[in-house]
Design a protein with these regions (language model features):
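Short alpha-helical segments that sit at the start of domains
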Residues: 1-24
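A short, conserved structural fragment
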Residues: 55-64
Length: 99
């Protein structure tokens, strides 16, 4: 069975989507992209707490850029989960549009 992201919060899923989209996904860059998407400020602590959880749960890998900055990359588990979620949403959207 492939990995899923169904137990993640919407905010955590959004973080995964942002990480997949950024050329160099680092904490404040992720925060900035989320703020652009939401159209409002996002609490820095909330971002880093959720990044840490996603690393601990095996959805992200963390590596150091320098002494103060970490970058994040999707794991295979995250990529499979995003793909699974995409197919799930697509099927429901197709049905909703057809109705």
């Amino acid at each position: 069975m492939s990995a899923t992201v169904k137990h993640l919060s919407a905010f955590q899923r959004d973080i995964l989507y942002v990480v997949s989209d950024l050329e160099t996904p680092y904490g404040l860059g992720i925060k900035s992209a989320l703020e652009e998407y939401y159209g409002e400020d996002v609490n820095t602590g909330r971002v880093y707490q959720n990044l840490s959880t996603l690393v601990d749960d095996g959805y992200l890998e963390k590596s150091s850029i320098d002494k103060r900055t970490n970058s994040y990359t999707l794991t295979e588990k995250a990529m499979q989960g995003i793909e699974h979620r995409h197919h799930w949403q697509e099927a429901r959207a197709d049905r909703a549009i057809a109705d």
